[in-house]
Every structure is written in structure tokens, then in C-alpha cells.
Amino acid sequence: MLFRSWREERLEDLKRMARFDCLTNNADRKAIHCILGRVGRVWGIDHGMTFHDEPKLRTVIWDFAGDPIDPELISRLRALAERLPVDIAALLSEAECAAVGDRARELAELGSLPYDETGRRYPWPLV
């Protein structure tokens, strides 16, 4: 079979990617950027349109808006909001580091994945 949909069987992986997109402010997640590897791992292929200090989130994984974030991850988000790991901070500008902290804090406070209130943050094709 040349193509088969694996979306339903890999929902947790896609939700993890959605949380990552929100945290990193991914500006261009398309369905083609979600690839199922040979051993069943989901890979997110990105091109560097992430970590911007201005809100630019565009993702095809809005399906999970409103889904709760588990308590363990919320505590990790709070820790990240307080201090970004040095190896990541070294790659980002001060403004980008502050924005990651702000997004981590906002996600922890919200406790769920956000909704696209504009209705315009959908790159194509959808997942």
C-alpha cells in the first residue's frame, strides 16, 4: 500500500507534537511535516520557523485544542518558564528565550492546548 492513514493509531504522538508546536511557536507545521518512521516513531520535520518572539503559531494540529495537559508536564512547563536549559538558551536571542518562558507559563496556566481564536492559523494540508 503506497499510502495509509496512521493518524488514529498515533494520536498521542501527534498531541505531543502539538504541545511542542505551542511551546516553540512553530510557524509552519503542515501535515507533510508529520512522518511515520519505519519502526512506528512519528517524526516532526521542521525548517527553523520556530522560537520567534512574536506570536506566529500556525499548525495543522488544532484538532487537539482544549485537550488537557497532564500534571507532570504542567510542572515541567513551570520549571521551563523559570529557567530555560543553557544549551537551548545559547541558541536563542534574549527575546526568544523570554518568549519561550512566557509560552511555557501560559500553557501551564491554561492547563490545556489553546484554540485558534483567529480561525486563520491553518497551513495546508491538514493532518
Question: What is the meaning of each model-derived region?
Answer:
Residues 1-127:
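Phosphate/dinucleotide-binding and metal-coordinating scaffold of catalytic cores
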